[in-house]
Amino acid sequence: MKTYRIACIPGDGIGKEVVPAGQEVLQALAAAGANFRFEFTSFDWGGDYYRAHGKMMPDDGLEPLRDKDAILFGSAGDPHIPDHITLWGLRLKICQGFDQYANVRPTRILPGIDGPLKRCTAADLDWIIVRENSEGEYAGVGGRAHQGHPNEVATDVSVMTRSGVERIMRFAFKLAQSRPRKLLTVVTKSNAQRHAMVMWDEIALQISREFPDVKWDKELVDACTARMVNRPASLDTLVATNLHADILSDLAAALAGSLGIAPTGNIDPERRYPSMFEPIHGSAFDIMGKGLANPIGTFWSCVMMLEHLGESEAAARLMRAIESVTADKSLHTGDLGGSATTVQVTEAVCRRLKS
């Protein structure tokens, strides 16, 4: 029997509640006749670790993750620690250290969930947003000088490389090719950013020639936000820079009903390193410890993890269980207008996996 070694990093806030819920659901799936099992290793990194050690994770923290088949992550963020420390000290350290250059965020309106767009049906909103996850606006290049003085200066430099853009474009075109509509929208801002984004556009055109069966178009990022709201059915697969996709994918999750249901995968397509899967919601300290967190985003992230591991049948089974639960409005958590608890939603998914 195959054993998948999964690193679990709950992180901060409600991450400490939804990651154990994800483990419980994966164990229930494995126990329900699957031909594999899971071996979980938990890492207590995050804000509490920072308070004890002055860093979000150990300096050599990537090493115990390196031999794992995948990483299940919760959330990063602590109201008592600057955001740039919590993000760069943990999540981005893993993403960049393992060259997880493709961030993939599927968005659908799940059964039983009401999206805010009154003329948008579930069939109209079925997207995947591909985010360049290794460079661009989050390359980490920049600095500050003359801090505290009137002439203080600070820079954050967006860095794009030909190799980095080529590989994310090729990944996005290949993903679009695998979907029924074979449709890709390349998000840009080359009208105002006339160097790196122009190169981005040129490389998109170049890579498109490798995929003659994929229909593609180009959309300015500001216009894309309006298109997502006004013409959602015109979109299918999107590819955007690190910052642009970060913003667009949160809008996408909101249009699908809640950030609490949205998953993401930080993927190393070449499989040199473990990929990392996580819900996109934040640490939500306001509801931490109250049992109110929506675990659906974590469960859907587990579906993505199973697909990445090649367990497509098990992934489909878990997704059916998730959709059966969201279809029952008595099992909606507060972010969806209900009063169900994390435990109730988790137990309901586990019951459906066992039945």
Give residue ranges: language-model regions:
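Buried hydrophobic packing segments
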Residues: G22, L26, A204, T298-L306, ...
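Glycine-rich phosphate/diphosphate-binding loop of Rossmann-like nucleotide-binding domains
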Residues: A7-E24, L29, G33, H149-V221
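Glycine-rich phosphate/nucleotide-binding loop
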Residues: G47-Y49, V104, R227-S330
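Buried hydrophobic positions in well-ordered alpha/beta secondary-structure cores of metabolic enzymes
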Residues: D12-G15, D69, V130, A172, ...
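N-terminal glycine-rich phosphate/adenylate-binding segment common to multiple enzyme folds
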Residues: Y50-T155, L243
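Glycine-rich phosphate/pyrophosphate-binding loop and the adjoining helix
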Residues: G140-V186, S190-R194, S312, R317, ...
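Short acidic loop-to-helix transition motifs that present clustered carboxylates
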Residues: G112, E219-A226
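N-terminal beta-loop-helix "entrance" segment that forms/cooperates
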Residues: N35-D59, M228
